[in-house]
Amino acid sequence: SCWKWYHPPVFQKKSKQIINKESSIDGVRDYLRNAVDRQMLADVPVGAFLSGGLDSSAIVSFAREKDKDIRCFTIEAQGEKEKGTTDDLQYARRVAKHLNVSLDVVQISSTKMASDIELMVKTLDEPIADPAALNVLYISQLAREQGIKVLLSGAGGDDLFTGYRRHYALMTEHWWTWLPIKIRNTLCNVSSKLNQNNLLGRRVTKLFSGANLEGDERLVNYFSWIQRDDLKK
């Protein structure tokens, strides 16, 4: 056999290529529709995850053009929710009603998730602290029980369309990265003393935790869950 390193295609911008906003929007719509069309080609029923967010909603919208009876699935987390978090169910129901598609709701509890943590750790190939993988498991189990073995997902859309908070953090940098390093050090130190039990406090601390770093190091810091100093302890 022959092995070869995979090299992903790199976009080569033509020097005279001019793309306006309207053309960009139409292009993204066409590419996304074609991608969904390809995934709808299956010899088994196809369903979809639906959180009510932009990514999954767009995918379901295009999928419905091929199958008006497509079944969608979402999660309802029972119990008290963390302050500052959003319940996807209300948005998923609004989108399902707007698109006139069926929506199955999987109800889960923190007790159920806690009991399945060990299963998640054994199943995944790498250490991941995000329990969202369990949501995928529960939805997939229900879908399979109903005879649906293929589910379309909007996972990865936040990376492609800059939907994470770290992308917004990068957008704020022009307001403060020009400050002298001593002032940025102060921002870093002061923000670290904010109340970490408060969602806003944690996010401000995260934003300025790399204020004393430069360029690429600051970008890496936005992607990190554990600070370097904590790793050294």
Please state what every model-predicted region is:
Residues H7-K233:
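ATP-dependent adenylate-handling active sites, centered on carboxylate activation for C-N bond formation
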Residues S1:
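Active-site-adjacent helix-turn-beta-strand microarchitecture at beta-sheet edges
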